[in-house]
Amino acid sequence: MFNFEVISSCSNTEARTGIFHTPHGQVRTPRFMPVGTLATVKGISSQQLKSTGSEMILSNTFHLHLQPGEKLIKEAGGIHEFMNWDKPVLTDSGGYQVFSLAKLNNITNEGVEFKNPRDGSPVFLSPDKVMRIQMDLGSDIAMAFDHCPPHTATENDIQDSLNRTHLWLENCVETHKKSNQALFGIVQGGRYPKLREISAKFTSSFGLPGIAVGGVSVGESVEQIHNVINFVPKFLPKDKPRYLMGIGSLKEITLAIAKGFDLFDCVLPTRLGRHGTAFFNDERWNIRNARFKNDFSPIDKTCKCETCKSYSRAYLHHLVRNDEILGLTLISLHNIAHLLRFTNAISAAIKDNCFTIDFAPWKRSSIAHHTW
């Protein structure tokens, strides 16, 4: 039911293209996943999302548990029926909230007690409970519960969090018995190569359908992010999809693909879109700026997304300057389509054996320009 095929490999780098088979269809890799925390990519319908070429989205177990609750979603027929999305869904475990809500939680080896950010009521999550929530949600991929420490943590604290993550993975594997849902483990270890190596080898030992690398892009320097991207893949199995969590910039995605990563997610395209910022090649344009007021060209004349096919920069400028929701939706749609177009171009370049670490297909001088 879950199978990963490597289709082509790059002779210049560790990059590869592949297909991950799930009960709700195929995911072609390398692939960016839009983030739909509450079973919605903010401001975008499922039909609009399909128009961008999205093949899998990410939702969040912690937030869906709080509202509307996994039992209601199960009653609706699972997350796919609930949100009218017939393609694959990955649910994050809530491990990131262990990091982001650190001031509101208490962590032990048994689990994490949170204060509900909505009303302050106590919420307890354990590995067993997180697995049961995700089984009720009915996602295609369930992430193991992990402890994501802050990037400023000491080596001893990161070692403790790593031990806890490994203990929780064992508990998750023991609980997770759903054959039509894949369980992915998560590699932690902070900025310490030895801890990352230990975690990668431990997580790989379970033979799970896929492996993620977490604790990246949580406030550390770009150099530290690159160190993890460069170092960890050598300890991961080559026959499983590799998911680098929380990465959405073109530079980091390019490096990660070159090192053999396959899946990525980030809130960046929609968060920036909601603030009126659009992607163009490797630039970010604030559409609110006056220079777009009388510009009747699309954001990108080479882009085939619904926004670029139908609307001008001037119209989008008008919408965002007047805080019209449609403007933020249209820019978010373009940004998602742009990232997916970028990973599609990388896939084509890998197949044509012209992918390099400085991949920039929008440049006419690029050997991979034909992929753009």
UniProtKB/Swiss-Prot annotation:
GO terms for biological process: queuosine biosynthetic process; tRNA wobble guanine modification; tRNA-guanine transglycosylation. It is an enzyme of class 2 (transferase). Transmembrane segments: none annotated. The keyword Signal does not apply. Residues 246-252, 270-274 are annotated as: RNA binding. Keywords: Glycosyltransferase, Metal-binding, Queuosine biosynthesis, Transferase, tRNA processing, Zinc. Its EC number is 2.4.2.29. Binds 1 zinc ion per subunit. Its cofactor is Zn(2+). Coiled coil: none annotated. Signal peptide: none annotated. Zn(2+) binds at residues 303, 305, 308, 334. Pathway: tRNA modification; tRNA-queuosine biosynthesis. The keyword Metal-binding applies. It comes from the Bacteria. PANTHER family: QUEUINE TRNA-RIBOSYLTRANSFERASE. Belongs to the queuine tRNA-ribosyltransferase family. NCBIfam families: Q_tRNA_tgt (TIGR00430), tgt_general (TIGR00449). Homodimer. Within each dimer, one monomer is responsible for RNA recognition and catalysis, while the other monomer binds to the replacement base PreQ1. Catalyzes the base-exchange of a guanine (G) residue with the queuine precursor 7-aminomethyl-7-deazaguanine (PreQ1) at position 34 (anticodon wobble position) in tRNAs with GU(N) anticodons (tRNA-Asp, -Asn, -His and -Tyr). Catalysis occurs through a double-displacement mechanism. The nucleophile active site attacks the C1' of nucleotide 34 to detach the guanine base from the RNA, forming a covalent enzyme-RNA intermediate. The proton acceptor active site deprotonates the incoming PreQ1, allowing a nucleophilic attack on the C1' of the ribose to form the product. This is Queuine tRNA-ribosyltransferase. It comes from Prochlorococcus marinus (strain MIT 9515). The lineage of its organism: Bacteria, Bacillati, Cyanobacteriota, Cyanophyceae, Synechococcales.
